[in-house]
Design a protein with these regions (language model features):
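A detector for small-residue-rich transmembrane helices and their helix-helix packing motifs
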Residues: 1-227
Length: 227
């Protein structure tokens, strides 16, 4: 059976991705300013232009990070979520999910921001794809991606709600919040492709939690207004 076989998978791809991101950051950290700027513009994702990497920039941008905080925050979540997802779905599916989430998040961002000449870098879009898979396929799997041990469905919903709020209020933080949501969407599609029944159950669980939170918020607001 699929579950028995995939359960034996070790997080080798997760570890390889983390290692590659760290190595690329070391190149940026110790490179000259001119070299680093050239690297970011040639291998980062620029919606209005294609750099020296050509279409390959849809992959290379995922392995570049702006600073240590950017790197550590992404890799912390990748380690916490990635190893669990990889063990569950298998290394091959995991790798394809990761790349597909990052690539299509980049493509949609390019399509919706065609005039932007700002390079986009970072693994967040791909990582949000993995977050979606954990939310749908492993809703009750406890993860420390947000430092506190939380079920995957709670962790995923919190992050998605934060990103939705950031997009709605147009937060100007130098962060491509829209790409996080695009990556999450691709991850959801991937989860349904891997195991429709499990993903559907995970979706129902997530929707029930959101409904409960909405009812609680309405009730709580009513209590405050009455008081």
């Amino acid at each position: 059976m699929f579950m028995a076989e995939s359960g034996k998978s070790k997080p080798t791809v997760t570890n390889a991705l983390i290692t590659l991101c760290v190595l690329m950051f070391m190149v940026i950290l110790f490179g000259s300013k001119g070299f680093v700027m050239s690297l970011l513009f040639d291998y980062g994702l620029i919606p209005s232009a294609i750099g020296a990497a050509g279409p390959l920039s849809l992959v290379t941008y995922m392995f570049l990070h702006a600073n240590l905080a950017h790197l550590v925050s992404n890799l912390f979540v990748l380690h916490a979520v990635g190893r669990e997802v990889e063990r569950d779905v298998g290394s091959l599916r995991f790798g394809l999910l990761y790349l597909a989430s990052g690539i299509f998040a980049g493509l949609i961002h390019m399509a919706t921001n065609p005039a932007s000449d700002v390079p986009v870098i970072g693994a967040s879009g791909a990582i949000f794809g993995l977050i979606a898979v954990m939310l749908l396929l492993m809703p009750f799997k406890v993860t420390t991606a947000l430092f506190l041990p939380l079920p995957g469905v709670v962790m995923g919903l919190l992050l998605v709600l934060i990103e939705v709020a950031a997009v709605i209020v147009s937060v100007e933080s130098g962060v491509a919040h829209d790409m996080h949501l695009y990556g999450f969407l691709i991850g959801c599609i991937g989860a349904f492709a891997i195991d429709y029944d499990r993903a559907f159950r995970g979706l129902v669980i997530a929707l029930l939690i959101l409904l409960a939170l909405y009812i609680w918020a309405v009730y709580f607001e009513g209590v405050l207004m009455i008081g």
